[in-house]
Curated annotation (Swiss-Prot):
Record organism: Neurospora crassa (strain ATCC 24698 / 74-OR23-1A / CBS 708.71 / DSM 1257 / FGSC 987)
C3H1-type zinc-finger residues: 221-249
Chain intervals annotated as zinc finger (RING-type): 310-349
Coiled coil residues, start to end: none
Role according to the record: Involved in pre-mRNA splicing.
UniProt region (Disordered), positions on chain: 1-114, 162-184, 370-405
Comp. bias intervals (Basic residues): 31-46, 74-83
Name of the protein this chain belongs to: Pre-mRNA-splicing factor cwc-24
GO CC annotation terms, alphabetical: U2-type spliceosomal complex
Length: 405
């Protein structure tokens, strides 16, 4: 398809409108330079009076011009300045007073403005609150002492003194006497700000004299923390995690040891020496007691992991003791009574399934242990040693249990 060209159309003239403009047209400002003839017809302003002597240092531009509404005369008035103590009056009043015959003193009294004299030094400053200022406050007026020790630490602390050499360089001073200068000298050489007591002794190490009005007595006593369950029954549920000592032997407190030592020595302080061993062992006879002790130690090793009392009733085994499948020993009555409520083992918590075997070997070992303990107590009494009350009570209970059987 070919494009068709249209002939150009003539521009149409705007249609005349009869509507009036709504906004008025702003007038144009015209500036005209005044000629020499116009300047001659102007009225000259009267000369302003000279400033006072005290106000000579003020700026000459501190004047305000005002125009009198009644006469149309333009009068210059001096601007009020709070830093001057001069008496100020307008030139209009001055001219009126001279014309009316008023004296100068009356004019000053009527138009005097009293102001404070700012030339004198102020004793109090409202911005610094000097009325409540303390002696240890930081003062910013003195630039030399802004960062001094007295301003930073206050007046209540004493100034630290530094020693100087002849040349003026700082000498090696003690930690408490060195003034901080921002240099790190290590942890041991830090400055100390703790004030020392002048009455305190200068000695830092070594013995210090005790006060004469106080008497101190120190007594060290033997009181070990022994596991009560292990001592009474030979078994502890905590095992190796128990924080108490697992020991079944008898121990004595400090006062008991002292009493036993006094009974043995009978009050004698210097005891004669005794021979503890002999180098000649060829003619030494065989000691049957050592062999017996070795045999007893072997038996005790067997009974080390076996409690010598029932852990349920915490008493000696009554009737015939029984052993569970896990290897723990109980009284027959205690084991059956517990099995009615809880079928698990009282020592380890494993299931027993109602199986309790007779512990015949345990009965024989316990009898040997009782006989050996009785023999040791008898020998101790013969040597004059004291026997603990717990051993006697255990012996009596064991005899009572055997009698009941």
């Amino acid at each position: 398809m070919a494009d068709t060209e249209q002939p150009p159309t003539a521009p149409t003239a705007p249609e005349p409108t009869t509507a009036t403009p709504t906004a008025p047209i702003a007038p144009v400002a015209i500036f005209k330079k005044r000629g020499a003839k116009g300047k001659a017809n102007l009225r000259k302003r009267p000369a302003s009076p000279p400033p006072a002597a005290k106000d000579s240092d003020d700026d000459s531009s501190d004047f305000e011009s005002s125009e009198d509404e009644a006469t149309g005369q333009r009068i210059k008035r001096r601007k009020k300045n709070h830093h001057s103590a001069a008496v100020m009056a307008s030139s209009r009043d001055h001219n009126a007073s001279t014309n009316s015959g008023v004296t100068k003193e009356e004019q000053i009294r009527s138009n005097t403005i009293y102001e404070a004299d700012r030339d004198a030094a102020l004793r109090l400053d409202a911005t610094k609150q000097d009325a409540t200022k303390g002696s240890n406050w930081f003062d910013e007026d003195n630039e030399k002492e802004d960062l001094s020790v007295g301003n930073l630490l206050g007046r209540t602390r004493t100034m630290m003194k530094t020693k100087k050499k002849v040349g003026g360089e700082d000498d090696a001073v003690q930690n408490s006497e060195r003034e901080p200068d921002g240099t790190y000298r290590g942890l041991a050489n830090q400055a100390s700000y703790i004030q020392k007591n002048p009455n305190a002794p200068n000695r830092k190490v070594g013995p210090i004299k005790a006060p004469s009005n106080i008497r101190t007595i120190t007594i060290t006593d033997m009181a070990p923390d022994v596991c009560k369950d292990y001592k009474q029954t030979g078994f502890c549920g905590f095992g190796d995690n128990c924080k108490f000592l697992h020991a079944r032997e008898d121990y004595a407190h400090g006062w008991q040891l002292d009493k036993e030592w006094e009974n043995v020595t009978k009050g004698k302080k210097n005891l004669q020496g005794t021979v503890v061993a002999s180098a000649d062992r060829r003619n030494k006879p065989k000691n049957t007691a050592e062999e017996e002790e070795d045999a007893d130690a072997a038996e005790e090793a067997l009974l080390e992991n076996i409690p010598f009392a029932c852990i349920i009733c915490r008493g000696p085994y009554s009737n015939s003791p029984v052993v569970t499948r896990c290897g723990h020993y109980f009284c027959e009555a205690c084991a059956l009574k517990r099995y009615r409520k809880d079928p698990s083992c009282a020592a380890c918590g494993s299931g027993t399934n109602g199986v309790f075997n007779a512990a015949k070997r345990l009965a024989k070992l316990l009898e040997k242990k009782k006989a050996r303990a009785e023999r040791l107590r008898r020998e101790a009494r013969e040597r004059g040693e004291e026997v603990s009350e717990e051993e006697d009570e255990g012996e009596d209970e064991g005899e009572g249990a055997e009698g009941s059987d």
